[in-house]
């Protein structure tokens, strides 16, 4: 409030004074400084009512916003150009108010809503893939396993990764076909190699049901080889040429294994 009264006093004194010679203007030069005014104070209604919209002798500059107000010089053009160099000078006693008002002028940076619709914003969203999509196939296989097991009224605690560890592939090799008193023949063939799953289910009446998935040839052809022999009897060999292999599930019912299990259970001691 004291700063406001001081500024009003200076404005009223400068508005009433008449132009004086150069010697008197030099005496008033210390009063012709730049005063730091708060923007909220300049725009307040009470300040305009006390001072007026446009005080006498004050020029409004709308070229660029500034925190400083310069009072006009009544001297010549040479002195005005010299004072323009000091138009950005801040009084030492006004620096205290400048530091106190920095917090009011420093506003947080607001993000425009247009930036949220930029392509880079959505590209980053698309790059971050939800983690559950990576295991979508595993969850689906687990669901199908429980669904198929429920139809048989049996829920098997089998992990899905154990079911997908089956490997069965063809490995090329050179197969030699030989016979007594005949020339050996080399044939390019494939063998089945891999690891397939299997499980064993005990059944009623000591019967055991074994479900084995074996790595077997699924695509093959039979080839007849005529061997060159010294005997008068022709020798023909029949060879399976394997092209593809896969895990094939087979159900085996072995009563011999059932009898072995009953013998094993009969030898166990009874526990009360």
UniProtKB/Swiss-Prot annotation:
Family matches, as PROSITE patterns: CTCK_2
Glycosylated residue positions: 228
Provenance organism: Gallus gallus (Chicken)
Gene Ontology molecular function terms on file: BMP binding; cytokine activity; morphogen activity; protein homodimerization activity
Subcellular location: Secreted
Protein name: Cerberus
InterPro entries for the chain: Cerberus, Cys_knot_C, Cystine-knot_cytokine, DAN
Cleaved signal peptide residues: 1-19
Induction: By SHH signaling both in the head and in the trunk. On the left side in the head was also controlled by NODAL.
Pfam family, one: DAN
SMART domains: CT
Keyword Glycoprotein: yes
Lineage: Eukaryota, Metazoa, Chordata, Craniata, Vertebrata
The keyword NAD appears for this protein: no
Disulfide pairings: 168-215, 182-229, 192-245, 196-247
Coarse class of the protein's main subcellular location: secreted
Superkingdom of origin organism: Eukaryota
């Amino acid at each position: 409030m004291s700063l406001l009264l001081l500024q009003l006093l200076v404005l009223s004194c400068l508005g009433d004074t008449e132009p004086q010679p150069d010697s008197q203007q030099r005496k008033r030069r210390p009063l012709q400084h730049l005063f730091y005014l708060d923007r909220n104070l300049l725009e307040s209604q009470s300040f305009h009512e006390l001072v007026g919209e446009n005080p006498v002798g004050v020029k409004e500059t709308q070229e660029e916003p500034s925190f400083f107000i310069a009072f006009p010089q009544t001297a010549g053009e040479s002195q005005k150009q010299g004072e323009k160099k000091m138009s950005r000078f801040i009084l030492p006693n006004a620096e205290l108010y400048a530091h106190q008002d920095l917090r009011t002028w420093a506003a947080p940076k607001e993000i425009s809503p247009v930036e949220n619709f930029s392509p880079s914003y959505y590209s980053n969203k698309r790059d971050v893939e939800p983690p559950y999509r990576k295991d979508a196939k595993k969850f689906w296989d687990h669901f199908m396993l429980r669904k198929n097991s429920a139809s048989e009224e049996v829920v098997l605690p089998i992990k899905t990764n154990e079911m997908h560890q089956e490997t069965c592939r063809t490995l090329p090799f050179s197969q030699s076909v030989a016979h007594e008193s005949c020339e050996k023949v080399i044939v390019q063939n494939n063998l089945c190699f891999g690891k397939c799953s299997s499980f064993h289910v005990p059944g009623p009446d000591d019967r055991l049901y074994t479900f084995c998935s074996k790595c077997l040839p699924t695509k093959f052809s039979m080839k007849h080889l005529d061997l060159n022999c010294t005997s008068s009897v022709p020798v023909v060999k029949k060879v399976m040429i394997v092209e593809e292999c896969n895990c094939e599930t087979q159900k085996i019912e072995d009563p011999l294994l059932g009898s072995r299990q009953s013998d094993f259970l009969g030898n166990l001691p009874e526990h009360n």
